Amino acid sequence: MTAEQAAALIPHGVNVGMSGFTGAGYPKALPQAIAQHAKSEHAAGRPYKINVWTGASTAAEMDGALAEAGALGQRLPFNTDPTCRARINAGEIDFIDMHLSHVAQHAWFGFLGPMSVAVVEVLGVTEDGRLIPSTAVGNNKTWLEIADKVILEVNTKPPAKMEGMHDIYYGTAIPPRRVPIALTHADDRIGEPYLRVDPAKVVAVVETHKGDRDNVFAQPDANSNLIAASIIDFLAHEMKMGRLPKEMLPIQSGVGNVANAVLAGLLTGPFENLLGFTEVLQDGMLDLLRAGKMSRASATSISLSGSAYRDFEENIDFYRERIILRPQEISNHPELVRRLGVIAMNSMIEADIYGNINSTHVMGTGMMNGIGGSGDFARNGYLSFFVTPSVAKGGKISCIVPMCSHVDHTEHDTQIIVTEQG
């Protein structure tokens, strides 16, 4: 079926679950077709908006296109697209900013209303009807389970040899039927490599051949290197004092240039055989794997620059043995973050002198991106770092303030704040 034909199956006003997490694994064709359909409906004087739920952020060709077409009524839980952000802050799109570990369960509980359609990118379909996940798992497992109808985008662009990299856990349940999650090491496998779907719910299959968003990371600058050096010095000191084990604890790193620079700093640090237990695997963690400094990494998404993605494709056999992609309800699960003793490192907009952190709102009212998974890891991690250069906008704005204009993480969730000053 064409994307245009599939888009016509999605009526005005419904809740739509789409794949995608930090610019990876999002549908490439349907959002464009939905945007055009919305424009046609609006031109004919008819309303057309849908509510879109994802794993996290997507790309301009999805969030940007839908926002520009006026096709978004509601968006959750995270967004980085500037067009969508402007519409959110103008009050034209209802935005729900949520902890990423809460999204799947809130949808499953029914708190968000029924899901009419799931649009999920996969790499392929096996002979027995199982789905090969793409570059992001996110909330796809939940969307496929709770949606009334399913539209699959089969993307043949990502490496087919990614098959087997994923670990989809089907042991979750609704209270009071929950049981402990049997994951005791960051690189444990507790699920299966495929997604399940009821074939009777699949109403369309659309073929695509297109890569994910090309992320651009700035080279680590002097400030980023100073931040990384302070973190490494702190971790080495904690190890010396016996408060960190010599084999180190699993690392979580947030998204963005500063977080990526901190990972780059670990390349020259004294730590070996590192493990990653994070949301997004970006360039810095790939570098650690390739250099042998990190033995394995667990995430829910692979979001890379163009050059790093080419390396990933060319060395897929190497990376398939070292990377595990899980649903975000597992990658961000507070139970697992606490059990594993994850060392959390996340960026922020500002911190105040009391230790409160603002991760989401510029000047207290302007939504930036969202809280993402920082709260999942900050409150439950063994150590919780928040990092930022001490000033922004060329030195015009201080990132350390008397009192945060908006608080996402209270003083009780924050342990270590790091700038280039120390």
Residue ranges and their predicted role:
Residues 1-421:
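Conserved alpha/beta enzyme-core scaffold
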